[in-house]
């Protein structure tokens, strides 16, 4: 089983779209889309990881 991951190399970004493609973080928080999630990953210095796609 491959680990679930998202490429956040292009982040952080100053603004995210309102696109609704939820991701569940390792903090058990649902992020609205990849942009919101990746900005949080950068802020966490890489401690936040993707738990799974979809709502937590």
Curated annotation (Swiss-Prot):
This is Ovomucoid. The keyword Secreted applies. Disulfide bonds join 8-38, 16-35, 24-56. Gene3D superfamilies: 3.30.60.30. The keyword ATP-binding does not apply. Avian ovomucoid consists of three homologous, tandem Kazal family inhibitory domains. Residues 6-56 form the Kazal-like domain. InterPro entries: Bifunctional_prot_inhibitor (IPR051597), Kazal_dom (IPR002350), Kazal_dom_sf (IPR036058), Prot_inh_Kazal-m (IPR001239). It is found in: Secreted. PROSITE patterns: KAZAL_1, KAZAL_2. The record marks 18-19 as: Reactive bond 3. Glycans are attached at residue 45. Keywords: Disulfide bond, Glycoprotein, Protease inhibitor, Repeat, Secreted, Serine protease inhibitor. It comes from Pavo cristatus (Indian peafowl). GO terms for molecular function: serine-type endopeptidase inhibitor activity. GO terms for cellular component: extracellular space.
């Amino acid at each position: 089983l491959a680990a679930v991951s998202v490429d956040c190399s292009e982040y952080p970004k100053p603004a995210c779209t309102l696109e609704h493609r939820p991701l569940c973080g390792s903090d058990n928080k649902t992020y609205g889309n990849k942009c919101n999630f990746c900005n949080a990953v950068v802020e966490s210095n890489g401690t936040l990881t993707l738990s799974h796609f979809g709502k937590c």
